[in-house]
Amino acid sequence: MEDFVRQCFNPMIVELAEKAMKEYGEDLKIETNKFAAICTHLEVCFMYSDFHFINEQGESIVVELDDPNALLKHRFEIIEGRDRTMAWTVVNSICNTTGAEKPKFLPDLYDYKENRFIEIGVTRREVHIYYLEKANKIKSENTHIHIFSFTGEEMATKADYTLDEESRARIKTRLFTIRQEMANRGLWDSFRQSERGEETIEERFEITGTMRRLADQSLPPNFSCLENFRAYVDGFEPNGYIEGKLSQMSKEVNAKIEPFLKTTPRPIRLPDGPPCFQRSKFLLMDALKLSIEDPSHEGEGIPLYDAIKCMRTFFGWKEPYIVKPHEKGINPNYLLSWKQVLAELQDIENEEKIPRTKNMKKTSQLKWALGENMAPEKVDFDNCRDVSDLKQYDSDEPELRSLSSWIQNEFNKACELTDSTWIELDEIGEDVAPIEYIASMRRNYFTAEVSHCRATEYIMKGVYINTALLNASCAAMDDFQLIPMISKCRTKEGRRKTNLYGFIIKGRSHLRNDTDVVNFVSMEFSLTDPRLEPHKWEKYCVLEIGDMLLRSAIGQMSRPMFLYVRTNGTSKIKMKWGMEMRRCLLQSLQQIESMIEAESSVKEKDMTKEFFENKSETWPIGESPKGVEDGSIGKVCRTLLAKSVFNSLYASPQLEGFSAESRKLLLVVQALRDNLEPGTFDLEGLYEAIEECLINDPWVLLNASWFNSFLTHALR
């Protein structure tokens, strides 16, 4: 192919193509089809411009022979073929002198007669498909698009072909000749298919035969063929039409489409009120683990055996007492519940054989904590039809809460690395098809970046707790079963490690429907003093239960050990989703994969290796009050994973509503950034729908705060 290109094209064109490929770091010895495509595109641009001039009267004329007496100006300015810096200098100069709007992408030509930039396309596929790709990329009404194909077809914006028929015929003939020459040398098939990497859309989806007839038959009235309809749609101005249609709907509907400008959007209003509180089902950054390395005890792997072994590693137990009461609860009952757990664990140890499960005695404190006999009696509706004042319970509106800094700290912590590995390679699943080693390579790179992440620990902790709780809820419906909160990991040295975070005591669990609730009491170890951020722990009663010796650079120091106790509840459907938290790994991997795909399509080769191994490159992670935060690809992986994990941990109707409604505003802002001149009606109604979801949920409030930072920096 390289020899053919050098023989077929003018040496000046070949030299320009070589420079262009060098500028983009591409090897013409390897990417010979691309070399041919660049030369073809350059030649079409030059042919488009050749012989076209503007005379003294400002008229466009075609002059094939030089007339030394004519004062002629070239009709087209050629931008394609110049190096990027020079090309942008030319574009800026044209914009300054003609008042034309500066394009986002480098165009190929400027037409001084029509005062517009032109994007030339040469395709080996169907012109309509290539035209749409170009239009979607450029997203500008000010750049005129003209596409030629090797089969003699062409397509242009609003069916305005700019040049006379003879000039266009010359270009089409040249393209046809190139095709014939390639075919004679056996190069055409490879060249044609290379535009898409393998089989082209042209081969698979060319609209011919019956499909073409159906397309022509299914057009709206007054359109004779598909091309006419496409040209009409391409030049369609929607706003006035939409306004007209809306005004027909109802006398009350008066939708005036307002332009959406940089100054239009306002920040989302976050609620005032007391600070929001922690509402996750288990502790996150504040959790403390009692651990055993290389477990080899009798019954290893049985949760109760593992828990007792972990409890034996700690020697600093002391008489527990309340340090932060729950404002509305009977706090002595929480204290008594913990003492009961300790006592019953001691009883187990005194037995000859430790049982596999432990059902707690149904004491008054546990009955209170688990809401036993607290549910109102259910009465059949038919038995109370004649009750005159029958009504639903009065329920108070939820109290508005303000954003608190602890939730951002939780998120930051979730993105950090720990010194343990929380997933093995097979957590994401083995290849089920030989979809090539690229898929395995991406999975392995991604796993390496996230396997030590704290968010991954939360996944495995959530999977374990939800699985154990659902199993116990089905197997021991009437029992107050003691469920250890356990996770497993590997140390840096590769040794296995079993961790105990605390215990759950399950209440009665006759779960018939997906949404039926099982109550549980959670008791979790921590070194965090609750008095530092009491608002975070509103729902908890916190006990001090021991002193832990910690080794530090200075030496050993003693820290009080706390137990965070609260009553909580969950349902079958929530536990089912909790068991599937590993999906978060898959979701964030797919997001990373789409970034790799975008990069690969630009470079026209798989960029997986470069993507993960180029440690110097940074990527945008998110918005903060300081602006766009950048980080390594590993940090991007961990941030995306943490977002997915928090969406699972803090799932709620408020989050569903906020995500759906704020996305609409995000799309409008993105359209503005892409210079698409969006218009809106009832924007304030959209803001109301968004702000209606901002009540008291910490994760939703944090997302709203991030959205405001995005608005600030996106519209500068």
Curated annotation (Swiss-Prot):
GO process terms (BP): cap snatching; DNA-templated transcription; symbiont-mediated suppression of host gene expression; symbiont-mediated suppression of host mRNA transcription via inhibition of RNA polymerase II activity; viral RNA genome replication; viral translational frameshifting
Cofactor binding, per record: Binds 2 manganese ions per subunit.
PTM comment text: Phosphorylated on serines and threonines by host kinases, including human casein kinase II.
One cellular component (GO) term of this entry: host cell cytoplasm
EC main group: hydrolase
Keyword terms: Cap snatching, Endonuclease, Eukaryotic host gene expression shutoff by virus, Eukaryotic host transcription shutoff by virus, Host cytoplasm, Host gene expression shutoff by virus, Host nucleus, Host-virus interaction, Hydrolase, Inhibition of host RNA polymerase II by virus, Manganese, Metal-binding, Nuclease, Phosphoprotein
One GO molecular-function entry: RNA binding
Predominant location: host cell
Cofactor(s) the record lists: Mn(2+)
InterPro entries, per the entry: INFV_PA (IPR037534), PA/PA-X (IPR001009), PA/PA-X_sf (IPR038372)
Similarity comment: Belongs to the influenza viruses PA family.
Function in brief: Plays an essential role in viral RNA transcription and replication by forming the heterotrimeric polymerase complex together with PB1 and PB2 subunits. The complex transcribes viral mRNAs by using a unique mechanism called cap-snatching. It consists in the hijacking and cleavage of host capped pre-mRNAs. These short capped RNAs are then used as primers for viral mRNAs. The PB2 subunit is responsible for the binding of the 5' cap of cellular pre-mRNAs which are subsequently cleaved after 10-13 nucleotides by the PA subunit that carries the endonuclease activity.
Protein name: Polymerase acidic protein
Organism expressing this protein natively: Influenza A virus (strain A/Northern Territory/60/1968 H3N2) (Influenza A virus (strain NT60))
Taxonomic lineage of the native organism: Viruses, Riboviria, Orthornavirae, Negarnaviricota, Polyploviricotina
